[in-house]
């Protein structure tokens, strides 16, 4: 209940609102504990940065997964995937790297597209929502992306804010890896 008010807490804690962050995190953890029946069911979080925050704050009871990790562990063996004839760009966001799940992203992309270009960058520089206020961080973090993604028709990642900056600086549209999986399984 009241799902639209739930938040991983990063928006609060990253700005120094520790108490508000703890309240938001505790409220989300309790809601997910109930929804997952005390960890009986896995929980998918579509944003890697939010998942990283949740994993840092929550106890061990709830099984939390990021998009590509969830797809490779629970979906791909149940789906009929056809490899799309295109060259795509792939960006593993910072939090996915910190959780060491970027290989799931690459594995999923390679199941869905003929050619996958993995962007070589440690960080896009968007830094949560800081890219809105300090766009030069994002511009600097992605200063080489246009060359690296040359010839790619589109790009995929696991963080909407990162995807905003990636789209702006690469010249191609970036979106969730789930869009690629959906298209590769469409009949």
Write out the residue ranges for each language-model feature.
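Iron-sulfur cluster-binding electron-transfer modules in prokaryotic oxidoreductases
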Residues: 1-187
């Amino acid at each position: 209940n009241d799902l639209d008010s739930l938040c991983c807490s990063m928006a609060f804690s990253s700005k120094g609102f520790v108490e508000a962050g703890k309240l938001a995190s505790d409220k989300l953890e309790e809601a997910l504990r109930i929804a997952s029946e005390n960890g009986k069911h896995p929980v998918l979080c579509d944003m890697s940065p939010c998942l990283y925050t949740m994993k840092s704050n929550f106890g061990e009871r709830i099984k939390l997964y990021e998009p590509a990790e969830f797809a490779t562990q629970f979906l791909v063996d149940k789906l009929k995937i056809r490899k799309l004839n295109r060259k795509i760009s792939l960006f593993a966001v910072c939090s996915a790297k910190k959780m060491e799940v970027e290989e799931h992203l690459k594995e999923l992309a390679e199941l869905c597209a003929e050619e996958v270009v993995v962007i070589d960058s440690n960080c896009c520089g968007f830094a949560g929502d800081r890219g809105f206020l300090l766009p030069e961080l994002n511009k600097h973090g992605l200063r080489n992306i246009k060359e690296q993604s040359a010839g790619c028709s589109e790009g995929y990642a696991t963080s909407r804010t990162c995807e905003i900056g990636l789209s702006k600086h690469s010249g191609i549209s970036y979106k969730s890896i789930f869009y690629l999986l959906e298209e590769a399984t469409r009949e």
